[in-house]
Amino acid sequence: MTDRYAVIGHPIAHSRSPSIHARFAAQTGQDLAYDRLLAPLDGFEATARAFFAEGGRGLNVTLPFKEQAFSIADVRSPRVQAAGAANTLAWDGRTLFADNTDGLGLVRDLTGRWGQVLAGATVLMLGAGGAARGVVLPLLEAGVGRILVANRTIARAQALAARFADARVEGGGFDRLAQDAPADALLINATSAGLAEQGLPVPPAVYRRARFAYDMVYGAEPTAFLREARAAGCPASADG
C-alpha cells in the first residue's frame, strides 16, 4: 500500500518538498506519494483532518499554519511544547502527534552548510510567528549569546520572548534593530514576506552590519529579503 504524505501551507506552490521526498523514497525503497496541499487561510484544521480521514499518514506544516498545527495535536513533543508551534503532524489512526524539526534543521544548515559559528552570536530574528517560535530554543541550546525578536506587532515579539523565560531573548519592534543591532549579527527572516514579495522595514545599515542574512523560506529566485540584504551590502546570505 502506498503511504500518503503532503506538505500543507498557504501559499504552497513554491515548495520543493515533493521532489525532495521522492528522492528519499527512491533511496529507501519506500512506497509513498507526497503532494502539496493548499489550505484556505481559515481552513487549516478542516483540510488537515480531511487529509488524514482519507488515509493520509503525515503532514509537513509550513507558513502560516504552525501554531494551528500545535493546537490540533493530541500529543506534542517537548520541542513543540516549548515552541507552541509544530511543523510535523503524524497520524496513526487514533492519535495525532506533533513535532517541530525547524530549529534542528536551521542550526545544522547554518553550522554545517554555511560555516556559521553560533556560540556567543547575536541573532536578529525577524517575525514572531510559528517559524520563529520553532527555532528559538535550538538556537539557545547552540549557545547564541542573544536573540532580538523584531515584529510589526510588538506584543507578539514580547510574548515570544516571555515564553522562553531566558534573559538572552528580547522582543520589540523593527525600530529596535537600528538602535540595538550590533555589528557581526546573524540576521534571520522567519516571516512569510519573501513569499509575497514584500519588503521588511529593516534599515539598510542593519543589513550592512550583519555578517550573514538567512531567509527561512525559499523560492525559485532570491526572496525580497535576500535581495534587500545583498543590495544593502550584507557580505553573505542564503535561504533555507
How would you label these PLM feature ranges?
Residues 153, 177-201, 214:
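Rossmann-like NAD(P)-binding element
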Residues 167-184, 205:
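Short acidic low-complexity segments
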Residues 144-164:
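NAD(P)-binding Rossmann-fold cofactor-contacting core
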Residues 2-114:
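Phosphate/diphosphate ligand-binding glycine-rich loop within oxidoreductases
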Residues 68, 195-213, 224, 228:
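Rossmann-fold NAD(P) dinucleotide-binding segment
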Residues 9, 100-103, 110, 114, ...:
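Glycine-rich adenosine-cofactor-binding loop
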Residues 141-146, 232-235:
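Conserved S-adenosyl-L-methionine
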Residues 211-240:
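Rossmann-fold NAD(P)-binding glycine/threonine-rich loop
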